C-alpha cells in the first residue's frame, strides 16, 4: 500500500500545526505560570494529539470487497440516486465523531475519473440532508472491472476543513490514505445496485479493516 501522501502515518500530517500550537501554548504557560495553570492545557494538547492519530491498518484480501473509508458508525444504508453519476445506487454512510480516527482511505482499487468540490452548510453530519447540503468533496473511482464507486467526504457541525490529496487520473489502492476531515464528519460511499451488504445501521466500522459490501 502506498504511503506517499502520509510520510508519517502514525500522526496525520494535517494535524501537525494544531499539535505544535497546543504543545507550545502549554509549555509557555507552564514556564511563566507553573504546572497548576498549565495542566489543563497539557490535557488539551494530549486530546489534540489523539484526535490526529492515524494508525496503519491491515487490508483485507477478500476479492471484490468494498472497505470502510473511515472509522465511525453506519448511519445510512439506502437505495438512492447517486447525485454525482446520475444512476441508481446503494449508499452507505459512515459518521465520525470527534473521538474517531479522521483519516480517509480508499474503499476500492481504481482510477480517479473525476472530482467535485461543493461549498455548503455545516449541519450535523449524521443528518440525511447533510449528504447534499454540507460542504463536500466527491471522488469518482472506477475499478479495473469497470465498476463505478463514488466516495464523498462531508464536513460536519464542527468539521469545517476537508483535505483531499489526490486528483483525477491518479490511481488509488484499497486502504490508501487520500484525505482527512478535521474535527468530526461523514463519508458517503455510492455503489452499484446488487451489492452484498455486510453492515447495518448502527454498526461500528474501522477504516480499511471493515468490509462494507462485496461486488457480486
From Swiss-Prot:
It is found in: Cell membrane. Is synthesized initially as an inactive proenzyme. Formation of the active enzyme involves a self-maturation process in which the active site pyruvoyl group is generated from an internal serine residue via an autocatalytic post-translational modification. Two non-identical subunits are generated from the proenzyme in this reaction, and the pyruvate is formed at the N-terminus of the alpha chain, which is derived from the carboxyl end of the proenzyme. Keywords: Cell membrane, Decarboxylase, Lipid biosynthesis, Lipid metabolism, Lyase, Membrane, Phospholipid biosynthesis, Phospholipid metabolism, Pyruvate, Zymogen. GO terms for molecular function: phosphatidylserine decarboxylase activity. GO terms for cellular component: plasma membrane. It is an enzyme of class 4 (lyase). The modification Pyruvic acid (Ser) is found at residue 185. The active site is at 185 (schiff-base intermediate with substrate). It catalyses: a 1,2-diacyl-sn-glycero-3-phospho-L-serine + H(+) = a 1,2-diacyl-sn-glycero-3-phosphoethanolamine + CO2. The keyword Lyase applies. Its cofactor is pyruvate. It is a peripheral membrane protein. GO terms for biological process: phosphatidylethanolamine biosynthetic process. Its EC number is 4.1.1.65. Pathway: Phospholipid metabolism; phosphatidylethanolamine biosynthesis; phosphatidylethanolamine from CDP-diacylglycerol: step 2/2. Binds 1 pyruvoyl group covalently per subunit. It comes from the Bacteria. Catalyzes the formation of phosphatidylethanolamine (PtdEtn) from phosphatidylserine (PtdSer). Heterodimer of a large membrane-associated beta subunit and a small pyruvoyl-containing alpha subunit. Belongs to the phosphatidylserine decarboxylase family. PSD-A subfamily. This is Phosphatidylserine decarboxylase proenzyme. It comes from Nitrosomonas eutropha (strain DSM 101675 / C91 / Nm57). The gene is psd.
Amino acid at each position: 500500500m502506498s504511503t506517499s501522501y502520509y510520510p508519517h502515518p502514525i500522526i496525520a500530517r494535517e494535524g501537525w500545526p494544531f499539535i505544535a500550537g497546543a504543545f507550545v501554548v502549554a509549555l509557555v504557560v507552564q514556564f511563566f505560570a507553573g504546572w497548576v495553570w498549565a495542566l489543563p492545557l497539557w490535557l488539551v494538547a494530549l486530546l489534540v494529539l489523539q484526535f490526529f492519530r492515524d494508525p496503519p491498518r491491515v487490508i483485507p484480501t477478500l476479492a471484490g470487497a468494498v472497505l470502510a473509508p473511515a472509522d465511525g458508525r453506519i448511519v445510512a444504508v439506502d437505495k438512492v440516486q447517486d447525485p454525482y453519476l446520475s444512476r441508481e445506487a446503494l449508499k452507505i454512510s459512515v459518521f465520525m465523531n470527534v473521538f474517531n480516527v479522521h483519516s480517509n482511505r480508499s474503499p476500492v482499487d481504481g482510477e480517479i475519473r473525476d472530482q467535485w468540490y461543493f461549498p455548503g452548510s455545516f449541519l450535523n453530519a449524521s443528518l440525511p440532508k447533510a449528504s447534499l447540503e454540507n460542504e463536500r468533496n466527491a471522488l469518482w473511482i472506477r475499478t479495473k472491472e469497470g465498476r463505478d464507486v463514488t466516495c464523498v467526504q462531508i464536513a460536519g457541525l464542527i468539521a469545517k476543513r476537508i483535505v483531499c490529496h489526490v486528483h483525477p487520473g491518479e490511481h488509488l489502492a484499497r486502504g490508501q490514505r487520500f484525505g482527512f476531515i478535521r474535527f468530526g464528519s461523514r463519508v458517503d460511499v455510492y455503489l452499484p445496485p446488487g451489492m452484498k451488504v455486510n453492515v447495518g445501521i448502527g454498526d461500528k466500522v474501522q477504516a480499511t479493516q471493515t468490509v462494507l459490501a462485496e461486488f457480486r
